[in-house]
Amino acid sequence: MARIAGVNIPTNKRVVIALQYIHGIGPKKAEEITEKVGIPAERRVNQLTDAEVLQIREAIDRDYVVEGDLRREVAMNIKRLMDLGCYRGLRHRRNLPVRGQRTHTNARTRKGKAKPIAGKKK
């Protein structure tokens, strides 16, 4: 099992698919990485040499923000919005939808479980 960017990637899958197990790498970036390194798309992880794994690891470290660094960057961006006090920051602070969705009904995922109101009946 190869370890890239702190993630154990599955050995029996194709390299393009296995790279997507890393947070921050999707289908497009996985294809870009394999093209840069020069690995065929149908090659599987267990067929890679140590040198190829090292090349992939270096390409990811050099060109992409992944895993913990990416999570930290996103969290800092949200914190910055909240500190500014802008509309998006206020919505994050109140755990409400940020991108203009309606909240009168719906928005249960963001707001959490419905809170019962005492004495209210139909």
Swiss-Prot record:
An annotated Gene Ontology molecular function: structural constituent of ribosome
Q: Which GO terms describe its biological process?
A: translation
> Where is the stretch described as Disordered?
95-122
Q: Which Gene3D superfamilies match?
A: 1.10.8.50, 30s ribosomal protein s13, domain 2
| Highest taxon listed in the record's lineage | Bacteria
UniProt KW Ribonucleoprotein keyword: yes
The UniProt keywords, alphabetically, are: Ribonucleoprotein, Ribosomal protein, RNA-binding, rRNA-binding, tRNA-binding
Cellular component terms per the entry's GO annotation: cytosol; small ribosomal subunit
**InterPro entries xref list:** Rbsml_uS13_C, Ribosomal_uS13, Ribosomal_uS13-like_H2TH, Ribosomal_uS13_bac-type, Ribosomal_uS13_CS
The record's function comment reads: Located at the top of the head of the 30S subunit, it contacts several helices of the 16S rRNA. In the 70S ribosome it contacts the 23S rRNA (bridge B1a) and protein L5 of the 50S subunit (bridge B1b), connecting the 2 subunits; these bridges are implicated in subunit movement. Contacts the tRNAs in the A and P-sites.
Task: Report the sequence similarity comment from the record.
Answer: Belongs to the universal ribosomal protein uS13 family.
Q: How does it associate, per the subunit comment?
A: Part of the 30S ribosomal subunit. Forms a loose heterodimer with protein S19. Forms two bridges to the 50S subunit in the 70S ribosome.
Record-given protein name: Small ribosomal subunit protein uS13
Organism this protein belongs to: Methylobacterium sp. (strain 4-46)
